[in-house]
Amino acid sequence: MSGLPHSPHALVTGGGRGIGRQIASELVRAGATVTVLGRHRAALDDAVTAGAAHFADVADVTDQAAVSAAIAAAAARQPIDILIANAGIAESAPFAKSDAAMFRRMIDVNFMGVVHAIQAALPSMKDRPYGRIVAVASTAGLKGYAYVSAYSAAKHAVVGLVRSLALELAYTQVTVNAVCPGFTDTDLVAGSIDNIMKKTGRNREQAAGELSRHNPQGRLVTPGEVADTVLWLCGEGASAITGQAIAVAGGEV
């Protein structure tokens, strides 16, 4: 498997924690210069201090102007070769109780956040000899789950964007793909487990089992497994892989 080209610059949105931080760390180990972008300065600075990234910029992915400014600042340090559009949030509720504001939150962060990052990074990336865009979607972008209709709709939109944009860019050296993790052992899923416990009275093991039962391997995915897939897609040997939505879910979907 071919690795990364020499010292590419990678920018990871939502890179201060969870899957995003793991991806950033793996990219650093593979020889990339890594900038993490997110809302919380403390988490971003901690990633830099821990060696999981080299630089950190603060921006809310729902704010197009802020994202554009942050990505321009990062590109001024070194042109961006790799964009990992990872930032996301999840909320659950029955459809009847999912109001318009909830749908807007899910779309604004999980879909428009991806759009904003790509629109800011792509123009200069297209002119470079190598470019990789990877969106972190979800198995909820490939199938439905009860009680997360807003989240699932947003993640389906990400997969549709990836498939369409890959065709537009097929003549360039830029590939566009999505990774679609199943339930992953992160603080985001820990929050979902807490929510299940609160609403159902189940203990932590039972609540975690409610999520891991979707995985044919009977477990939660690890952030490292997602990061390994992203790293493969960023490699020079993956130049023919574009427009794909790759499930990292132990056989689910």
Question: For the regions a protein language model found, what residue spans apply to each?
Answer:
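Conserved glycine-rich cofactor-binding loop
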Residues: 16-17
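Substrate-binding pocket helix/loop in short-chain dehydrogenase/reductase
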Residues: 94-95, 99-107, 211
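Active-site helix of classical SDR
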Residues: 118, 154, 162
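Alpha-helical segment proximal to the catalytic Tyr-Lys
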Residues: 123, 167-168, 239
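Residue(s) in the substrate-gating loop at a strand-loop-helix junction
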Residues: 138
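Short, small/polar-rich loop/turn modules that mediate ligand/substrate recognition or access, typified
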Residues: 170, 175, 241-243
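C-terminal substrate-recognition "lid" of short-chain dehydrogenase/reductases
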Residues: 217-248
